[in-house]
């Protein structure tokens, strides 16, 4: 990832470092408009996800997470910026005339070829079932349900590791540190997701954050008692309770939010590291 550092010509450009990947203006059947609504509200108009709203209009790029063009080689034509995710995407032209977007694997360049299938080479960008991937291989875009498409390790710089195989399942170490059992028939893509330096970005000003559709975060102690359990008091007062709470009065910071009895508890061999 190329980071563009701004000169300190104004206060808003001081320490500003943004992604310099070129923004294309594609027009094909893989791109369509989307109606974004809600602004973090539910059907009743109540805020359920805070600090959301506004932002620039976006066109959605349809990404091929299934990689079901089996045994047909494709060539990387472009590497593009996607406003809907922090990873880059690649436009692939397959030999049969099909065009699809995929997540950009780290190290992939324009002109490289990729392929999907069961007996394809273990090469960066190729997709194949876990049963045909050697142990210790770095993978991403991992399926959980066969045929549904990749759902795990899709963020920028994300990478998982295939650590063992036993019976019909394979143990995969996910980016969070969780070790999970996945069917060996599920597919995954070899390599790491590109744009690994995304955490080095510094927007530098509040307006750039608003372009992304993220609104300001207000501390609970700065609110009134009617708005937050931490609110109220004379002057700069503490939260006024033993433990912090959410705006709805539930315990916060350190409380487990995962359901105690979930259908896939037996598939998780080790919980994620905090």
Curated annotation (Swiss-Prot):
Main subcellular localisation: plastid
SUPFAM superfamilies for the chain: Nucleic acid-binding proteins, Translation proteins SH3-like domain
Keywords: Chloroplast, Plastid, Ribonucleoprotein, Ribosomal protein
Highest taxon of source: Eukaryota
Gene3D superfamilies attached to this UniProt entry: 2.30.30.30, Nucleic acid-binding proteins, Ribosomal protein L2, domain 3
One GO CC term on file: mitochondrial large ribosomal subunit
SMART domains: Ribosomal_L2, Ribosomal_L2_C
GO aspect biological process, one term: mitochondrial translation
Record localization: Plastid, Chloroplast
One example GO MF annotation: rRNA binding
Subunit structure, interactors included: Part of the 50S ribosomal subunit.
Family: Belongs to the universal ribosomal protein uL2 family.
Xref: PANTHER family: LARGE RIBOSOMAL SUBUNIT PROTEIN UL2M, RIBOSOMAL PROTEIN L2
Name of the protein described by the UniProt record: Large ribosomal subunit protein uL2cz/uL2cy
Organism of derivation: Pelargonium hortorum
Taxonomic lineage from the root: Eukaryota, Viridiplantae, Streptophyta, Embryophyta, Tracheophyta
Designated gene of the protein: rpl2-A
């Amino acid at each position: 990832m190329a980071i563009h550092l701004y000169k300190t010509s104004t206060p808003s450009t001081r320490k500003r470092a943004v992604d310099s990947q070129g923004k294309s203006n594609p027009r094909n059947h893989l791109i369509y408009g989307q109606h974004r609504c809600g602004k973090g509200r539910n059907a009743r108009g109540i805020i359920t996800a805070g600090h959301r709203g506004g932002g620039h209009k976006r066109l959605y790029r349809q990404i091929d997470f299934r990689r079901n063009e089996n045994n047909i080689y494709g060539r990387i034509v472009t590497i593009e910026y996607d406003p809907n995710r922090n990873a880059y995407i690649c436009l692939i032209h397959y030999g049969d005339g099909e065009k699809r977007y995929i997540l950009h694997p780290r190290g992939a360049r324009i002109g490289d070829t990729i392929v999907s299938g069961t007996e394809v080479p273990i090469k960066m960008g190729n997709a194949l079932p876990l049963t045909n991937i050697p142990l210790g291989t770095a993978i991403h875009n991992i399926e959980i349900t066969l045929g549904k498409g990749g759902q795990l390790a899709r963020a920028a710089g994300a990478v998982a590791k295939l650590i063992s195989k036993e019976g019909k399942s394979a143990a995969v170490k996910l980016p969070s540190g969780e070790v999970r059992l996945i069917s060996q028939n599920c597919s995954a893509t070899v390599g790491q997701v590109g744009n690994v330096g995304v955490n080095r970005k510094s927007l530098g000003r509040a307006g750039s954050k608003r372009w992304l559709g993220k609104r300001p975060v207000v501390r609970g102690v700065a609110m009134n008692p009617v708005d937050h359990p931490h609110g109220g008091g004379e002057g700069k007062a503490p939260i006024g309770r033993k433990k912090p709470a959410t705006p709805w009065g539930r315990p916060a910071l350190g409380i487990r939010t995962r359901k105690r009895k979930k259908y896939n508890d037996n598939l998780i061999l080790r919980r994620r590291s905090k």
